[in-house]
From Swiss-Prot:
InterPro entries: Kelch-typ_b-propeller, Ppm1/Ppm2/Tcmp, SAM-dependent_MTases_sf
Pathway: tRNA modification; wybutosine-tRNA(Phe) biosynthesis
Bias kind Polar residues: ranges: 12-23
GO annotation, biological process: methylation; tRNA processing
The protein's name: tRNA wybutosine-synthesizing protein 4
Swiss-Prot/TrEMBL catalytic activity: 7-[(3S)-3-amino-3-carboxypropyl]wyosine(37) in tRNA(Phe) + S-adenosyl-L-methionine = 7-[(3S)-(3-amino-3-methoxycarbonyl)propyl]wyosine(37) in tRNA(Phe) + S-adenosyl-L-homocysteine; 7-[(3S)-(3-amino-3-methoxycarbonyl)propyl]wyosine(37) in tRNA(Phe) + S-adenosyl-L-methionine + CO2 = wybutosine(37) in tRNA(Phe) + S-adenosyl-L-homocysteine + 2 H(+)
Entry coiled-coil feature ranges: none
Length: 686
């Protein structure tokens, strides 16, 4: 790469540093971490979303864990030994100031390296800010020809290119870095922006140069799934491609990379495991209550695509692991796949009729009509809570086609809710229960939607009326991410409403029964041990009762239990279904019963690096099997969370409708097509 190419590359990487620094400033401003220095180093107001805050919080805590572990270990060494922290690509990070203010640099010093322009700008910022100067003590500012931009007794800032290792070594020597002292090398979202050969050379150079060292990196991984593809495309659009992911896509490959480069020990965790295993329950609860939050899928997927790694060498730093091993494995991988279910696109939707939304609900009104409402999606060229309805219907040539519909008349308007449920009452009528407008605004009341369709059953000329459902007074259902399932008691039809969350309660365990004929809430006895509360679970009807599977429980714990609300003479009885082999905990999936089997479709899990396909559970034997989805004939990526689905048993097909999400800071993605899964291989008796 020539000088101009290097300069352009430095500029694009610097833009990612600027964005990251602003996020860290917002993180501190909203109480996730204590960092009064972030605002001093990065001027200007900024407000990031709760999802961005959580993502940067777990990043900050993972790096903090490694830095504190290094300082604890080296503090036990003889008093003449000074520990060294070498931060590579440090940008506007406030690490030095936080450590100095906490009194953790009495026997340690910090060196930072970044592009010369970045380092000089930071040095100038420190020079002109009294609060920062108070931490550094007496200092010198280097001249424009020197690689040393800032120097104090325990802090150096250097301007250098990490790809030019000989010059880097000379600059560090000149700045007083002692290669024989215990050294922590920190590269926080840095190496992946280098060409793989340059990054590998840097890793090997560090192993050769520092006999007692710890190398910590925080980076992206898992580029091959749907979320990973959106992540890759985002950085490509920024002209900052993630070079290392093709050769080192998973943690195992990254560990091997360091071991082959001369590091003697290496361990790594994805951020879900770090968050669940190495942060206390009290700290997690503090963070989870700081702001209203309802983007669990994207939070867990973000954490599944980043890792923290610590490689060590030398007698001093290889004896104690940075990440203490756990007695129980965090990994809960699904069973080996029993086969594949082929997928194909079944709609030829035009842009104006496509179903690009998530968090919606769908109801199969008849074998030829699927009605969808609500959610967050694309409408009139922008992303918003969707006000238009969508109908998938059979055209005359037996192909599905989509149509968007607006509200008819002035009697009522759709309120834009999402994470509600929708239940078929007749071929033209559905009941909408619950939902939210925002994490602090539950939807108001139940709605009845009436679909008026043309006589030829084609999509043209259809309209919808919205009316308040005539439920009894005082029966407001202020929850979302719940389930509504048709059950029967004493030959009467009821809707069983279970779980969910509300503004006040992060998880609910409520059981409510709505008598369909009278639209009245009634009390029906339920025996057996009540299951733990949950939301974002699946529910489907079976043998007059309801099957409940998975979900997010208290403290945002993913659940794997499958429960049956069984009809008995006195009401209902909770039973737990024993499943072998046990299934991977998940949520945000859908479920159907087909040929005596419970199908769990898609969703999000954090205990496996694979992507959920379809889990098949025999309801007679409890035996489970896993099927992957063959997406070779489907435009990629396909995100199977926040979606809805409709079972067509006569055709042995399952339609996947909508889905997607706000993929952290990488952009929002909506599945562009309705997709059919072929279930013919799941015949009865198999």
């Amino acid at each position: 790469m020539g000088p101009r190419g290097r300069q352009r590359r430095a500029g694009t990487v610097q833009s990612t540093n600027d964005s990251s620094s602003l996020s860290k400033r917002s993180l501190a401003a909203h109480g996730y971490v204590r960092d009064p220095f972030a605002a001093l180093l990065v001027p200007g107001p900024v407000r990031r979303t709760p999802l961005i805050h959580r993502g940067y919080y777990v990043r900050a805590r993972a790096v903090r864990h490694c830095v504190r572990a290094f300082l604890e270990l080296t503090s036990a060494l003889p008093s003449r030994t000074r520990a060294q922290i070498l931060s590579l690509g440090s940008g506007s990070d406030s690490l030095y100031f936080r450590l100095k203010a906490a009194g953790l640099l009495a026997r340690a010093a910090v060196w930072e390296v970044d592009f010369p322009d970045v380092s000089r700008l930071k040095a100038e910022r420190i020079e002109e800010t009294p609060e920062l100067r108070a931490q550094t003590g007496p200092f010198k500012i280097g001249d424009s020809a020197s690689s040393l931009c800032f120097e104090s007794a325990d802090y150096r800032i250097l301007g250098a290119d990490l790809r030019e290792l000989q010059r880097l070594g000379e600059a560090l020597d000149g700045a007083g870095l002692d290669a024989t002292s215990p050294t922590l090398l920190l590269a926080e979202a840095v190496l992946t922006y280098l060409e793989p050969s340059s990054a590998t050379a840097l890793i090997a150079w560090a192993a050769q140069r520092f006999p007692d060292a710890l190398f910590v990196i925080y980076e992206q991984m898992q580029p091959g799934d749907a979320f990973g593809q959106i992540m890759l495309q985002h950085f490509q659009r920024l002209h900052s491609p993630l070079h290392g992911l093709e050769l080192f896509p998973v943690v195992k490959a990254q560990r091997q990379r360091f071991l082959q480069a001369g590091w003697t020990a290496c361990s790594a965790l994805d951020l879900n495991e770090f968050y669940r295993r190495l942060l206390s329950a009290e700290e997690r609860q503090r963070v989870e209550t700081l702001e209203p939050f309802d983007e669990y899928e994207e939070w867990h997927l973000k954490c599944s695509h980043y890792f923290i790694l610590a490689a060590s060498r030398g007698d001093i730093l290889s004896e104690t692991p940075v990440f203490e091993p756990s007695e129980a494995s965090f990994q809960i991988d699904p069973a080996s796949p029993s086969g594949f279910l082929s997928a194909r696109v079944v709609t030829s939707d035009h842009q104006h009729s496509s179903l690009k939304r998530y968090g919606h609900a769908s109801a199969l009104l008849s074998p030829g009509v699927i009605f969808s409402a609500g959610g967050f999606g694309e409408q009139e060229g922008r992303h918003c809570r969707v006000s238009r309805f969508h109908v998938l219907s059979r055209s005359c040539d037996s192909e599905w086609e989509g149509c968007q519909i607006s509200t008819l008349g002035t009697e009522g308007q759709w309120d834009g809710r999402l994470y509600h449920t929708m239940t078929r009452l007749s071929d033209t009528r559905v009941l909408v229960l619950g939902g939210r407008l925002s994490p602090v605004s539950p939807a108001s009341g139940a709605l009845q939607l009436d679909l008026y369709k043309s006589k030829d059953n084609c999509s043209e000329g259809q309209n919808v009326t919205v009316t308040k459902a005539a439920l009894e007074e005082g029966s407001v259902l202020s929850c979302w991410r719940h389930s509504t399932t048709e059950v029967y008691y004493q030959n009467q039809r009821y809707l069983f409403v279970y779980g969910g969350r509300s503004v006040a309660e992060p998880v609910l365990s409520d059981c409510r029964f709505l008598h369909v004929e009278t639209m009245a809430w009634v009390r029906i006895p339920v025996q057996g041990a009540s299951p733990e509360g949950r939301h974002s679970h699946s529910a489907c009807s079976w043998q007059g009762g309801a099957l409940i599977a998975g979900g997010l429980g208290a403290s945002e714990e993913l659940l794997s239990s499958v429960l049956f609300l069984k009809p008995v003479s006195s009401g209902f009885l909770w039973e737990s279904i024993d499943i072998q082999p046990s299934i991977t905990p998940r949520y945000s999936h859908t479920a159907h019963v087909f040929n005596g089997k419970l199908l769990l479709v898609g969703g999000v899990w954090i205990h496996s690096s694979s992507v959920p396909g379809v889990t098949v559970i025999c309801l007679t034997t409890g035996l489970s099997s896993e099927y992957q989805i063959d997406t070779a004939s489907v435009p990629w990526p396909l995100m199977l969370h926040n979606h809805s689905s409709a079972l067509l048993p006569e055709e042995q097909q399952l339609l996947l409708i909508g889905g997607g999400g706000n993929c952290f800071s990488f952009g929002t993605y909506f599945n562009p097509h309705t997709v059919a899964l072929d279930l013919s291989s799941l015949r009865s008796g198999q």
